[in-house]
Amino acid sequence: ITDAPGDFLSYTVDIVSLQLQRDDGTVVETLPVAATVDFARLVDLTEVISARQIPPGKYVAGSVTLDYASASRNIVVDDGSASGLVVNPVDGSGAALGSVVMQVQLDSGRPLVITARTAAHLAFDFDLLASNTVDTAAGTVTVNPVLVASVVPPDSKDLRVRGSLVGTDAAAGT
């Protein structure tokens, strides 16, 4: 998961689902537990949120489900003040947001192919600038999510992986 630049000091939401769909229609959940992510901090950082084993196959689509219900006080816009402006996320009609599902179709010429004993990388980029319209007077941010997926993540970003370190081998470089 990564993010394109935006005007937010904080944009913390829960990712409650990250699903991939194979070319035969099978849907695989890749996120074992919900993850809280601050997208404002992922502009120059890629975060691996799931290293779970994914069954072999050719994956052609995906979806990411974000939960905004607990995030209304965790979205802060840079308004020029020292602490920023806390805004409440709403949909296009002004109603408070709950869960939002973002669908993405992978490029047909570059599907995600998972095989036994090989690593594969898929980057989801949640574009904050394109996805959000801020109304500072109302203290709201209207969310219309834009998600882009690519099979090869950008090399220009640092990579952060969550989890326990099982072991290292300096001689083998692993």
Where is each model-derived feature located?
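A short, solvent-exposed, low-complexity linear motif enriched for acidic/polar residues
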Residues: 1-174
